[in-house]
Amino acid sequence: MNTKFKYIFSAAALLLSVGLTSCTGDLDVTPIDPNLNTKDNTSPESSLNKCYAHIAMAGNGGANGDSDVDGIDGGTSGYVRQLFNSQELTTDEAICAWGDEGISNMNFNTYDASHPMLKGFYYRLYVGITYCNQYLADFGDYNATMSAEVRFIRALNYYYLLDGWGNVPFTTAISSDKPARIQRADLYKWLIDELKNEVEPKLNDASPKTSTTTGYGRVDKAAAWMLLARLYMNAEVYTGTADWANAKLYAKKVIDSPYKLYTTKKGQWSAYQQLFMGDNGENGASVEAVFPILQDGLKTTSYGTTLYLMAGSNDNSEHIKSATVAGNNTTGGWAGNRMRPDLVLKFFPNNDAPNVAAYAMPAAADDDRALFDGEGRNVSNGDDEKSVKVFTNGFSVCKFNNFKTDGTAGHNALFPDADFFLMRAAEAYLMYAEADARQNNGTTTAQGTAYINALRTRANATTQTAYSLRQICDEWSREFYFEGLRRTTLIRFGYFGGNVNYNWNWKGGVKSGRNFDSHLNLFPIPTSDMVANSNLIQNTGY
């Protein structure tokens, strides 16, 4: 397949028109319209593209309609958008000013089985699984590598279901039968077996690419290693038995692969900043991108991917580039998500964060990763729920922007060209270091220390001779804030639900934070699915 992947998402989506049940419907009916013979109406290539595209786009209509998931606004249902909401708004990193239904429940950890955004994400994951099952039913014997890619995408979706919901409906086929409920530990085992036996051996060898390279945006062996490392990192949460040795093994495979930390500064832009810019597929940063989710301002548009991470976190008064240039280089400034004070403290532990613009903040923090704006803003999110809804109560995150290192314009005034690196090599460095510390009485060995120091050196931050687990948890936040990993990280460290006494501002709906029940370590199965499928059992506490 020689077509550059980034530029055929939209065409592929239009080529494949699949009839799915509404997200307010059920999983107990045939998810593919039985009157539509997809094998005769599309090609293996376009069917494969749709499996990828459901992560990058709302649906066949791009940003503006025909969403894959009904019952929720198409842009709101975006994969990355709801990954962010579920993983960031529920934690010590982000809080949102909006009054949309479900937002305050995420801010304050009070979600239940009717939560519209959790339901939307749940069904988007199953829509993607359906696309993958359909591809494998129609074209599973067509090309071994393509089938392995589809199996990886299906496994990735099941991984997010495993992580978020635990005991979920499970099917690998297109059928009118109600899916059986799979236990969390059994789904974990299935994922390990699937990735080791059916995915990794058949994927292409690990090879970083740029947007001008054939195959950019398609997964290779490194993505399988990364997902295996994620699974092993959280094995104790998922199964009750830790497996730090295998977490290190698969993280090391990524570290030793051709994927590397990107370390080249260009002009005013640090190496770290370039990972999140409008030309991150072209500027060299993609050497770190194990799995980039592709965006293009003209051809692959979405309100739920990098535009959400830019516009949703900015009001366009931020000064990212210079004192004379305001905004993130899109016309979007939706003034929603911003930092909780706890995240600011990760960079300014003495509680002395200055009210300076984004372009000046990294120097003030002595850390290139401090990509946020404090100009005209308060560190505090406010003293009551009304003040939480004021966007300037909280520093504005400017991590993602649509500027380009060569100064050229974006392809579109609103929709960015910045890809979202769903998996990047830096994650393997931190996974190895954490697993290393857990095998060494809570402190890194020389090798684990070296991997964290590599990240900190890239960020021009000071290094240390060793790191404790608490320091590693903070380092996860500094390196990956607003990238959709935090909730999983806090649960793994024992810092989320239960009597953990790790509190943050507005945790549990109290300004000073409070413990909440451990049942919130799992999301609730949506009520609509519970009603539709008698095989399911609601997670405890809902």
Over which residues does each language-model region extend?
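Conserved, well-structured interaction surfaces
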Residues: E45-N49, A53-G59, E93-W165, D177-K189, ...
